[in-house]
């Protein structure tokens, strides 16, 4: 009896240890830096002394060429015998997924991110197994093999877009195929994101549940093998159309396990099925642990399993009795998902869609019939094309209503609450705090502990946001300087092009800046996208005809932040944030003009930024200033003093006070 009891206690311990070892393996493999394989063309760049290399490659397209957001270029992924590379075209050529090509062009390394808050091609491509880019100069199509799945997707998407237009047609196609397969117009996609409805366009468990909700009742009277075969066919078709994305495979695997458990006569345990599905996928692909879509999919599903029902019961007690009972159930689902995914949204985006719960509540009655309608239209596009125009009319009305609701929520004040991206430690504290507050099995003591952790995390994050900070981001010819004082922020940019504005927008979201007080553009050329810059700052000063945006005697200022020119006919500026005084010298002419006016020995600055590489003589002169910090944009020169800092070819520097 003793031996039997001991064995019974030992068995859970062994299983727990095995599970911990598996999870440890997944984490270690996922966190290992991705490297190109032995014969990957990226290795040729490492051996070459030039940043670019003329090269000819042969491979298979992994997708149709797609326009890059915010640029006029076009890109597609090419599968090589070993490894992958991204093809870059000036204009999108009429090429299709599955075609074999011979391409000639210049191979280069994808640009790395200069700052953790900025997205860059290098990180995006590494997750796709590519470590190089080829700027295509010429190409030949070698083979056009049959690609029935890609042709089916393309036919469905083109038919829906042709009938309902690029906006609503893109939404209808995304409801069937997912936004990862069908590009939705950028402005509309941003509206879905701002309103907290991005999940509606991403192929996920919701779309699979809608599909199975139609298929399973149709096979209810069939024998069990036929019933399971029908469900398996529906799930297989879903994977074929939406593609083997992490969130899609998670939903399908979880649905298959749940169906198998129910058909075997056992009681389904959703949390166990979710854990088993996620673990199985991570064992096969450990890198998916860092995939944002997979993280959000698993966490949102866990929220529905663990807390949707308790939240519904709590809302029923809290809401007035005259409100309909279904309101509590309808509110509990998006509320649980929003609470559980809040740490991930802050970690990855630094933005919270403030109206996500009411937006989901309003569109909930539309999504299921609209998804079913879109699926029916996709089938008609393939099976009975002549009926498609007539059948599209009612579905298009529903889609028009959905788009209007999404745009209305996206245009509300503070639709995207930019709190900034907290440090991973604060995200961990926030996660623990929310779990202690929302898990129904925990008692009052845990709730008080969670509330305390929440207060600590918020207080620390707000103190970091309120400190005086200066951030330099350097990337190629781009320099961005973000000055912050007590939660306010101002921007100085060396360039006024659209890419610089896009980078500034990403920085503002990640830093928790709703809007810059002012933006000073030192580029002698007029801004490429003035509307973009005006959206970033309350006041934008830029050159219109090659003249300087600020003349001597003028001053650009807001509370605790100011910029003023320090020399005639130059871009030399004095930047003040709080009690800090920084001298900004974007080019050598600015240094000469400043020295001509004040002489080489004038100091009194806390820091100095150089946008160019100084000569040895200039370094000696600058050392006499005795500034606390000396920053350089670019690579570290030989003989550079150890106390001075350089951003590197693509990097950033940051100073914090208070």
What kind of feature is each model-predicted range?
Residues 1-7:
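N-terminal Lys/Arg-rich, disordered targeting/topogenic segments
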Residues 148-164, 171, 188, 196-197, ...:
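Hydrophobic alpha-helical segments of integral membrane proteins
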């Amino acid at each position: 009896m003793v031996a039997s009891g001991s064995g019974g206690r030992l068995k859970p311990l062994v299983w727990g240890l095995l599970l911990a070892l598996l999870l440890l393996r997944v984490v270690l493999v996922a966190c290992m830096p991705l490297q190109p394989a032995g014969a990957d063309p990226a290795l040729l760049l490492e051996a070459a002394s030039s940043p670019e290399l003329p090269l000819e490659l042969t491979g298979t397209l992994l997708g149709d060429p797609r326009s890059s957001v915010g640029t006029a270029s076009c890109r597609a992924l090419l599968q090589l015998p070993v490894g992958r590379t991204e093809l870059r075209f000036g204009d999108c050529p009429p090429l299709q997924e599955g075609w074999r090509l011979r391409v000639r062009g210049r191979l280069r390394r994808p640009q790395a991110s200069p700052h953790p808050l900025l997205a860059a091609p290098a990180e995006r491509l590494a997750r796709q197994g590519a470590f190089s880019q080829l700027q295509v100069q010429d190409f030949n199509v070698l083979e056009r093999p049959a690609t029935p799945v890609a042709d089916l997707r393309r036919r469905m998407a083109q038919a829906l877009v042709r009938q309902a237009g690029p906006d609503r047609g893109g939404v209808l196609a995304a409801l069937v195929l997912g936004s990862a397969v069908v590009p939705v117009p950028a402005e509309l996609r941003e509206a879905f994101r701002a309103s907290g409805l991005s999940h509606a366009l991403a192929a996920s468990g919701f779309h699979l549940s809608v599909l199975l909700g139609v298929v399973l009742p149709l096979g209810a009277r069939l024998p069990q093998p036929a019933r399971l075969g029908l469900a398996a066919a529906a799930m297989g078709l879903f994977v074929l159309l939406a593609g083997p994305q992490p969130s899609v495979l998670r939903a399908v695997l979880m649905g298959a396990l749940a169906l198998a458990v129910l058909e075997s006569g056992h009681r389904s345990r959703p949390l166990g099925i979710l854990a088993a599905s996620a673990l199985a996928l991570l064992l096969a692909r450990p890198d998916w642990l860092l995939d944002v879509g997979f993280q959000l999919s698993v966490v949102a599903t866990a929220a529905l399993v663990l807390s949707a029902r308790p939240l519904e019961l709590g809302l029923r007690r809290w809401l007035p009795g005259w409100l309909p009972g279904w309101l509590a159930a309808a509110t509990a689902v998006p509320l649980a998902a929003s609470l559980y995914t809040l740490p991930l949204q802050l970690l990855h985006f630094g933005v919270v869609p403030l109206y996500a719960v009411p937006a989901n509540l309003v569109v909930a009655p539309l999504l299921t019939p609209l998804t079913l309608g879109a699926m029916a239209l996709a089938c008609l596009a393939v099976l009975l094309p002549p009926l498609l125009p007539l059948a599209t009319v009612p579905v298009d009305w529903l889609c028009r209503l959905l788009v209007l609701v999404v745009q209305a929520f996206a245009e509300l004040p503070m639709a995207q609450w930019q709190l900034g991206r907290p440090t991973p430690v604060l995200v961990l504290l926030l996660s623990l705090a929310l779990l202690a507050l929302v898990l129904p099995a925990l008692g009052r003591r845990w709730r008080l502990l969670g509330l305390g952790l929440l207060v600590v995390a918020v207080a620390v994050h707000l103190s970091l946001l309120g400190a005086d900070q200066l951030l330099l981001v350097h990337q190629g010819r781009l320099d961005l300087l973000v000055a912050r004082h007590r939660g306010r922020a101002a921007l100085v940019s060396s360039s006024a092009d659209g890419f610089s504005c896009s980078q500034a927008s990403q920085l503002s979201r990640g830093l928790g800046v709703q809007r810059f007080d002012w933006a000073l553009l030192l580029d002698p050329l007029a801004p490429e996208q003035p509307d973009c810059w005006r959206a970033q700052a309350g006041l934008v000063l830029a050159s219109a005809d090659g003249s300087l945006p600020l003349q001597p005697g003028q001053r650009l200022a807001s509370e605790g932040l100011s910029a003023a020119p320090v020399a005639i006919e130059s871009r030399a500026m004095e930047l003040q944030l709080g009690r800090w005084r920084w001298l900004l010298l974007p080019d050598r002419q600015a240094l000469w003009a400043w020295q001509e006016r004040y002489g080489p020995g004038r100091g009194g600055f806390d820091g100095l930024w150089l946008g160019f590489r100084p000569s040895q003589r200039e370094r000696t002169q600058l050392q006499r200033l005795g500034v606390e910090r000396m920053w350089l944009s670019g690579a570290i020169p030989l003989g550079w003093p150890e106390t001075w800092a350089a951003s590197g070819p693509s990097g950033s520097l940051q100073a914090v006070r208070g």
